[in-house]
């Protein structure tokens, strides 16, 4: 943690797969460490880190086709991790946390989450969630969609936009919800 009072670390199983997260209070015996998360599904690996804005401790779990992010506010390191967005089979997502300090209408902070996911489009989309609206868990597709990948050339592209799979190679593709760059 940024205050140097707590250390979170992963445990490895016999196959060197990170599968559990432990919490250690600096200055106490390792025997007092507490398991805060265990991944039972052997297809998933586990990682732990601090969010970019240093406001959350983040556990990331992932298999080849499915991911999940759990979070815990850094000011409550003895609390319980919560899924940011609950795990959904064959859906990948990642979250970056940011905070515009003092940028609210009355000087309050504006915590945001930038979510990159493939729930609605095989080539992913990016949503921004204003975390002032409610506590997690959030749902995939919540927030403001700011960019969408092209479904062109994807195995399931026609599920997103009918006819896109039959477009000739080299055909320009533009999605009106993407910003002009």
Label for each model-derived stretch:
Residues 2-3, 10-20, 39-43, 61-68, ...:
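A flexible loop/linker signature enriched in serine peptidases of the S9 family
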Residues 28-40, 75-86, 134-145, 170:
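Blade-edge beta-strand/turn elements of extracellular beta-propeller
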